[in-house]
Amino acid sequence: MQPTRNESTTKRPPVRREPLDRSSSDAVIHDGTAYIAAQVPDDGLATVAEQTQSVLDKLDAVLARCGTSKRKLLTATVYCADSRHFDEVNTRWDAWVPWHDPPGCQYVVAKLRKREHKISIQVAAAI
């Protein structure tokens, strides 16, 4: 005989979305994890270092809205339009991420949505 499932064991945690616009969310929170959409810089004409700092500042803000911080990062994916930018991006990243709480991180060369964007970062964090 199959055991019956009671209501409390079959309920799933709610999904919370931090809206960005109609087609995407800045973050989706589920089961104690915040999945942050890839953030892009505000100024596409800025230097790589400035674009990176802009993205890191945006990540701080989105993480705070989700009730977490960079200290609880689980993973990070850094997208660069050109592999020659990795060293400059990594300098800013290393200054920003807590050295004693680093996430699993990967760097990817990718064509970004807007040609002037040189950097984009996507993260997931524990709540």
For the regions a language model picked out, list residue spans one by one:
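N-terminal presequence-like segments and the immediate start of the first folded domain
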Residues: M1-L74, C80-I127
